[in-house]
């Protein structure tokens, strides 16, 4: 700008200044994967800028004029078509939660030296996306840093095998079949199950365990035996009903539908591996939407990145009692199971860890993994469904319970406090769509969580604004 002003000050004949508007993104990389960016002509190229380009751009008007052969105006301009300005677009994203999720995910990816990471947070009550972040990122205000691998919105575009995060849905299908009850006992001895030439293994021999323990210990043999008993069709039917294998309907450019394997004939090992999340792929957003079904008592609602004026009723895809039973089981996974690091102070949460082997050129890798955690908070009356993916951690820890669960814990704790959600009873009723109304023990301390805002990431314009919003939220709490 200083150089430009200096040139204009020279008053060189034929040189003049023209004002041009350019998009500036105050949240920069924090919302880059959602908002996207425009080109030099202000045409959307990525993200919601592309998806809603016509809505945001409006339409230019038209005027007709008549000039003589010397270019002089012979008739006043006549309006042919009025211009229509672009319309506003209100996103469902809560910028406080978005920043917090961005910060926690970035720190986890750096800590575990992972190649990438994703986190998505859905409002269980509405289906709205409250936060959606990825690593690595790019800054839309710095076009020189736009590399393809940084620009991908992995929450919607990247498909992963869900691993053990899928096990709750295998259990749901088993309960739905009537062939298993929540107190059914499954013999997993001796910790290895042979299926022809293949084997299914648990980490250790858990012996005879009930279904809750199958999830708490993440027993591959337990869910395999359930799936083999009820057959793959019942499992596949449930997976389709909760939204897997199909687009979530956000309208986001490049969203993947995932993959569900439909076969005329299934081998035993194919049924077994399906039961614990191999042989199919999902996006993190699809997985989060599926978990909202458990959180809402069996109701599936479409996902939206746009703020909703009217909350859709959704459709019932799972019996309410089964959904609530699963929530109680997921609570046990966090309390005494593989998801212990997902716990948060003052709130009860539930969820499932997952650790899937990455696929390489020669099949499944022996030393490369994807760590995941999918959960609900608070578990008694879920408000949030959160999925965390840590891709290819190269540090000492790679299990989802060690890499992704702590991120869930930090993000869920901050989000519940910022949203003003009060701690409540912990038990989930099997027959009620709402939580137990018993109050929390007075021994549990409820400490308001404060969002650390850094100008370094949010920019000098936005950080103070968010601080003031946060202060209001804390005062209300």
Where on the chain are the PLM-derived regions?
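Extracytoplasmic/secreted proteins, especially bacterial periplasmic and envelope-associated proteins
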Residues: 2, 6, 29, 33, ...
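Beta-lactam-recognizing serine transpeptidase/beta-lactamase-like catalytic domain environment
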Residues: 67-78, 119, 123-164, 169-394, ...
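Small/polar-residue-rich segments within soluble enzyme cores
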Residues: 1-86, 388, 406
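Flexible, solvent-exposed loop/hinge segments and secondary-structure transition points
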Residues: 11-12, 42, 105-126, 134, ...
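Soluble periplasmic/extracytoplasmic beta-strand elements of cell-envelope proteins
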Residues: 6, 16-18, 33-37, 55, ...
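Ligand-recognition elements built from short beta-strands and adjacent flexible loops
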Residues: 260, 346, 410-477
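Short, small/polar residue-rich loop motifs at catalytic or cofactor-binding pockets
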Residues: 60, 113-116, 187
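Conserved, well-ordered alpha-helix/loop/beta-strand core segments that scaffold catalytic motifs
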Residues: 74-117
